[in-house]
């Protein structure tokens, strides 16, 4: 593997090998990350990357599209079957571009949209001022009840009645509870708004049938294809409304994109096929079991979990009672081979670059085959590290760093990722 890269560009070869080592021997707990199968990776690295295919299957602006048409048709068919949708667009390069396409298809610049506040668990593209969504549209953010730390649906309704948004966005990047899509649709209908659900984080759970399917209530659904879906990096748009489908297709191409990434679209098709298996369903069940177990283990050790737990693949740990910042915790854990990300919490008092919490997700460690027993081990290691941080830069006592780094390596060696499947690379 990578022998041609090694010959042509030793510097990038070194990057590939060292990143492989980092993934193989480190604990990946970033909720938005996962490990794609070699089938997905091989497809992404194929000669399909050479082909331009502006347009849609059978309606291209270039010749020679017979085989890429077939790849995109398979991706569309499988996405529709997987999520029970009548229409699917598999061309978005990312989740952000999927969201942009829906906004521009259903609203005009200057129109009002509602989305969850970033500091309460939303996403940049749901109306953050620094993002295109916050610059192009008038944004009315909603949040969580500060006591329950779950979505305040009465407040969502009050804001919707007051501001009459064109689009209401449900979904987030750091919200651990199941969202009441029915309630959101009722609110949207009451004010004549479109309901858009961004299921990027929990799409894999939906595909496996262990999480409510937002398509039952949403006018349109967006997603990424990595994260819990465990596919290539990319976006997806689903709807049951033919008029919305037409508008979305025109907005993706020629509206905001040119040539689609055919190597990625083919890899999406592979990912969707993998997601139809019983093995994938069992995997998703274990992802949630692992998240619940790890959250419980943190609570046993005196940590506060935002909203008191999780229904999904992720949870937020409030570090305020431990007198450590999210930034320091992230650095401390990374020095021991454990990757998480700092994250704001509801009613955040610190900058997003410092934050008071960390977000933890179980998709990647579950892909390795880890179960509840290992979640207890991981929680114990994280607690040991965070209890031995000696400064605001996240420096860990040397003896603790050495001890935990060794334990992380041993745990990862018990659950190999790629090393027993890749030939020609010594790691």
Curated annotation (Swiss-Prot):
It is an enzyme of class 2 (transferase). Pfam families: SHMT (PF00464). Keywords: Amino-acid biosynthesis, Cytoplasm, One-carbon metabolism, Pyridoxal phosphate, Transferase. GO terms for cellular component: cytoplasm; cytosol. It catalyses: (6R)-5,10-methylene-5,6,7,8-tetrahydrofolate + glycine + H2O = (6S)-5,6,7,8-tetrahydrofolate + L-serine. PROSITE patterns: SHMT. (6S)-5,6,7,8-tetrahydrofolate binds at residues 118, 122-124, 243, 351-353. It is found in: Cytoplasm. One of its GO terms (biological process) is tetrahydrofolate interconversion. The modification N6-(pyridoxal phosphate)lysine is found at residue 227. Its EC number is 2.1.2.1. Belongs to the SHMT family. Homodimer. This is Serine hydroxymethyltransferase. The lineage of its organism: Bacteria, Thermotogati, Thermotogota, Thermotogae, Thermotogales.
């Amino acid at each position: 593997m990578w022998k041609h890269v090694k010959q042509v560009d030793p510097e990038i070869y070194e990057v590939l090998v060292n990143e492989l080592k980092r993934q193989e021997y480190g604990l990946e707990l970033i909720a938005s990350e996962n490990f794609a199968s070699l089938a997905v990776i091989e497809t992404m690295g194929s000669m399909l990357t050479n082909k331009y295919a502006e347009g849609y299957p059978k309606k291209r602006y270039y010749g020679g599209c017979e085989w890429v048409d077939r790849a995109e048709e398979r991706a569309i068919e499988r996405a529709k079957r997987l999520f029970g949708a009548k229409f699917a667009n598999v061309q978005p390069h990312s989740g952000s571009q999927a969201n942009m396409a829906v906004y521009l298809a259903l609203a005009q610049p200057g129109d009002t949209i509602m989305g969850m506040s970033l500091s309460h668990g939303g996403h940049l593209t749901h109306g953050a001022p620094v993002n295109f969504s916050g610059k192009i549209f008038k944004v009315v953010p909603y949040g969580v009840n500060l006591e329950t730390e779950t979505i305040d649906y009465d407040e969502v309704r009050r804001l919707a009645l007051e501001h009459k948004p064109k689009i209401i966005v449900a979904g987030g990047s750091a919200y651990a509870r199941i969202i009441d899509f029915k309630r959101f649709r009722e609110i949207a209908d009451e004010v004549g708004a479109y309901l858009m659900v961004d299921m990027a984080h929990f799409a894999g759970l939906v595909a496996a049938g262990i999480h409510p399917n937002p398509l039952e209530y949403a006018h349109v659904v967006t997603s990424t294809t990595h994260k819990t879906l465990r596919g290539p990096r990319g976006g997806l748009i689903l709807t049951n409304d033919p008029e919305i489908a037409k508008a979305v297709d025109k907005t993706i191409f020629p509206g905001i994109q040119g040539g689609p990434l055919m190597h990625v679209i083919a890899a999406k098709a592979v990912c969707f096929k993998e997601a139809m298996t019983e093995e994938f369903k069992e995997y998703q069940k274990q992802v949630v079991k692992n998240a619940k177990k790890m959250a419980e283990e943190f609570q046993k050790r005196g940590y506060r979990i935002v909203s008191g737990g999780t229904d999904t693949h992720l949870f937020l740990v409030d570090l305020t009672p431990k007198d450590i910042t999210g930034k320091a915790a992230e650095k401390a854990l990374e020095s021991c081979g454990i990757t998480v990300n700092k994250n704001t919490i509801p009613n955040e008092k610190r900058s997003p670059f410092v934050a008071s919490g960390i977000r933890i997700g179980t998709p990647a460690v579950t892909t390795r085959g880890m179960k509840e027993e290992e979640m207890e081990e991981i929680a114990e290691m994280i607690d040991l590290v965070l209890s031995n941080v000696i400064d605001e830069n996240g420096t860990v006592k040397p003896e603790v760093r050495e001890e935990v780094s060794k334990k992380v390596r041993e745990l990862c060696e018990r659950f190999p990722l790629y090393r027993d499947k890749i030939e020609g690379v010594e790691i």
